[in-house]
Amino acid sequence: GWRDRVYVTSKSPWWIMENPGDFEKFFDESRRAIGTDVIDFYHIHMIMHRGWKEKVLPFRLIDRIMKLKEQGKIRFAGFSFHDRLQLFKEVVESAPWDFCLIQHNYLDYEYEAGCLGPKYAAANGMGLAVMKPVRTGFLANLPASMRAALRSTGVEKPDTEWALDYLWDIPEVSVAVSGMGSMADVEANLRYASKAEPN
C-alpha cells in the first residue's frame, strides 16, 4: 500500500458546474480516478470574484465541502485563490477552512493575496500552500539584469534557490507547490529542500 505513505489532494472546478449536485459528482469522479475512498486535501479551485458570486455562494459549495469533511470523505477542506486581497479576506472569513492555496513569489509580492495573504491565513488558523513559487519557470531562468541584482548581494546561488528561499523564510508558508515536469525536477527540488536553511 501506497495510500498510507502519501497525502492525496484534488480540486473542485466550479466553472463547469451547471447545478449544485455537480459538486458531489465531480468529487466522486476524483475519488474513482485516484483510487481512494478518502481525499486528504480537497479544495474549491480557483476562487475569484465571478466564481464566488455566480457559483460558490449560490450553489452553497462551502456547505457542501464542509459536509464531505463531516462525513469523513475528506480530511481537510480548503480553497485555491486568484483575485484581490479584499476578496481573499472575505473567503477566509466565510468558513472554518483548514487550508488555502495562493500564488506567491518574490516577483508577485503585491499580486492577488500578496504578501499579506499568508499572514491573514495564519491569523485565521489556516495552513498555507503556495503555488507558482518560481512563477511558471520565469524565476528559475532570470534575465541577466535580475540575476545581476541578486548577485550584487554577494550571495551566489541558482535562480530557483532564490525563489524557494524567499518562500521558506515566510513562517506562515506550510508548503511550496512547485510545478515539475520530470523526475529530475522532483529530485532537484528534494535535494535543495533537504539542505535549505533560513536566510
Identify the residue ranges that each predicted region occupies:
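Distinct, well-ordered alpha-helical segments
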Residues: 1, 20-31, 52-61, 83-96, ...
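Structured C-terminal cap/extension of enzyme domains
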Residues: 94-96, 115-199
